[in-house]
Amino acid sequence: MSYAQQMIQSNPSPARGGDALATCIEACFDCAQACTACADACLGEQDPKALARCIRLNLDCADLCDVTGRIVSRQTALEPRMVHAALQACATACKLCGDECEQHGQHGMEHCRVCAEACRRCEQACNALIGQFAA
């Protein structure tokens, strides 16, 4: 059992989303790490200037994934509209970053391929959970 699942189950406030919630929390934090590492790897490439858009999207996506993971981890006095907005923003960031990284991944940048995979997983996890929270 993951730490996210253990924390959800041990929280005295009932959680919305069940397994989808734990999956989303884990996907958000995994994606934040992948995006941060991908931005760093892009900076180490021969022509990092050519990767400016990718680096920017990586950093923005990492920030949104991190904050979304923290927001959806909190169950006490939950504000559904806040959670919904965070999930939407995170899914959008993951889509944009994943699309950009996928292009570079197809040209041999393995770090971008891995990051695109993490972005797709997080985007799917956010979209799977978003229905649990009213807009």
Predicted features by range, described:
Residues 1-135:
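Amphipathic alpha-helical hairpins
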